[in-house]
Swiss-Prot record:
Keyword Transport among record annotations: yes
Highest taxon listed in the record's lineage: Eukaryota
Main location: endoplasmic reticulum
Cellular compartments annotated: Endoplasmic reticulum membrane; Microsome membrane; Mitochondrion
A Pfam family per the record: Cyt-b5
Molecular function GO terms recorded: electron transfer activity; heme binding; metal ion binding
TM regions (residue ranges): 105-125
A GO BP annotation: ergosterol biosynthetic process
Protein name per its UniProtKB record: Probable cytochrome b5 2
Recorded GO CC terms: endoplasmic reticulum membrane; intracellular membrane-bounded organelle; mitochondrion
Species this protein is from: Schizosaccharomyces pombe (strain 972 / ATCC 24843)
Chain sites annotated for binding heme: 38, 62
Keywords tagged on the record: Electron transport, Endoplasmic reticulum, Heme, Iron, Membrane, Metal-binding, Microsome, Mitochondrion, Transmembrane, Transmembrane helix, Transport
Domain called Cytochrome b5 heme-binding: residue spans: 3-79
Gene expressing this chain: oca8
Length: 129
């Protein structure tokens, strides 16, 4: 029997507490019935709804038992297309780094960098004579 394939569009539709899909390593899981049992709390999973959760799943360092449990919720393989919508990746709320390279650097960050550079050279000039 052939593996079921699930499109990105389909995954994106399942993003609520009652109907929740996540993707880990291009495998799609329906974890709707697991929310209450998740040791890390249901909010962690809700934040990952309809997204690629590969990064956060790996970052947590789930045990072999947790990985086997996840397989019980497997429903198919993700079908990605070049011209179709892309699956959102996770951010800080979902346990990722929160860094989004598509966002410009804020002026406050530039000011912080400038202050640090000036402090570095002042330290070298006046303290490390």
């Amino acid at each position: 029997m052939a593996e079921k394939t699930i499109t990105v569009e389909e995954v994106l539709k399942h993003n609520t507490r009652d109907d929740l899909y996540i993707v880990v390593k291009d495998k799609v899981y329906d974890i709707s019935k697991f929310l209450d049992a998740h040791p890390g709390g249901e909010e962690v999973l809700v934040d990952l709804a309809g997204r690629d959760a590969s990064g956060p799943f790996e970052d947590v360092g789930h045990s072999e038992d947790a990985q086997e449990l996840l397989e019980k919720f497997y429903i198919g393989n993700l079908l990605r297309t070049e011209d179709g919508p892309q699956l959102p990746t996770t951010g800080a709320a979902a346990g990722g780094s929160g860094y989004d390279s598509s966002q410009p650097v804020k002026p406050a960050m530039w000011l912080f960098v400038l202050v640090m550079v000036v402090a570095y050279f002042a330290f070298r000039k006046y303290v490390l004579k």
